[in-house]
Amino acid sequence: MKIYLLTLTFALTISVFSSESEMPNTNAQTMLLVHKTPTCGCCKKWIKHIEMSGLNTTTKNHESLEEIKATYNIKPEYRSCHTGVSEDGYIFEGHIPSQYINQFLSEDHPNAI
């Protein structure tokens, strides 16, 4: 009985540790640079939402975002009041919920533009 219990305990311990190491941990290291205007109130609320999900942000205020949008090739019909850029260069335009940003960043996207 003791051998069976020890084996079962060991197997469960291995299982727990292996599943923890396989889980993505994007929040701990992910930084988004958020380009916005200094007067936009909804951007501040979105940044708070993002930070509450565990993502880190750095904010850069601009009087106009036209040049930023052009730099990242964001077409006029897709432009919003702020642009978030991950360290890997992924662009998040507008009020994207944090759950989708976390999900996207935890997956591989070899063909993303």
List the predicted regions and their residue ranges:
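Boundary at the C-terminal end of the N-terminal hydrophobic targeting segment
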Residues: S18-S21, A28
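Local sequence-structure signature of Cys/Sec-based thiol-disulfide redox active-site neighborhoods
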Residues: N25-S53
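Short active-site oxyanion
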Residues: M31-L32, L55-T57, D88-I91
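Solvent-exposed loop/turn segments at secondary-structure junctions
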Residues: P38-G41, L65, G89-F92
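N-terminal, post-signal-peptide region of Sec/Tat-exported proteins
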Residues: C43-S86
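Thiol/selenol-based redox catalytic cores and closely related redox-interacting motifs
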Residues: A70-T71, E77-I113
